[in-house]
A protein has these predicted regions:
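Short, strongly hydrophobic alpha-helical membrane anchors
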Residues: 1-4, 154-156
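A Zn2+-metalloprotease active-site environment signal
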Residues: 2-88
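Active-site-proximal gating segments in proteases and membrane effectors
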Residues: 67, 71-77, 81-156
Length: 156
């Protein structure tokens, strides 16, 4: 729900759209550079020659490989904003921390900063738990997970 309320679908389209426009500019530059340098050797006559397609795939792939940390950061930032929205809506930081610990069974909880920057498209468990505990420290009136769960699971 946080993604919807925070308009992440539109922000994401714009931000990734900018990356794609830059990708096509890089593709144009990369193909022209390669054709000037190796076009005769490869017997590729120009950018309109169908033989340029493998080169286009390679240039595009290299661009997005290098841009992976940027695209992951775009996604990770929106995920963190949605997490904060969820904490403000539910006001259950202990529940958030418990869920993040459960997610740690199949996902690394405490990556290094470089590892998180390059490979993680969502905040790490450590980042999410730390944010939940900071939120809890700033909102002492919030309910703990036990207080919320007791009425639901109490025997009658």
């Amino acid at each position: 729900m946080g993604h919807y309320v925070l308009n992440h679908e539109y922000k994401g389209l714009v931000e990734i759209g900018v990356v794609v426009v830059i990708a096509f500019a890089f593709l144009h530059w990369g193909i022209n550079f390669s054709l000037k340098r190796w076009g005769q050797k490869w017997d590729v006559r120009g950018i309109t020659d169908v033989a340029v397609l493998p080169l286009a795939v390679i240039v595009f792939s290299l661009f997005f490989l290098v841009m992976t940390p940027v695209t992951n950061t775009i996604t990770r930032t929106m995920e963190f904003e949605a997490d904060m929205y969820g904490l403000n809506a539910a006001q259950q930081p202990d529940g958030e921390a418990n869920v993040d610990l459960m997610l740690g069974e199949y996902r690394k909880l405490d990556p290094g900063p470089v590892e998180e920057f390059i490979f993680f498209d969502h905040p790490s468990g450590r980042t999410r738990i730390t944010a939940a505990m900071r939120w809890k420290a700033g909102h002492p009136e919030s309910a703990s997970a036990d207080e919320v769960a007791r009425p639901v699971f109490a025997k009658q």
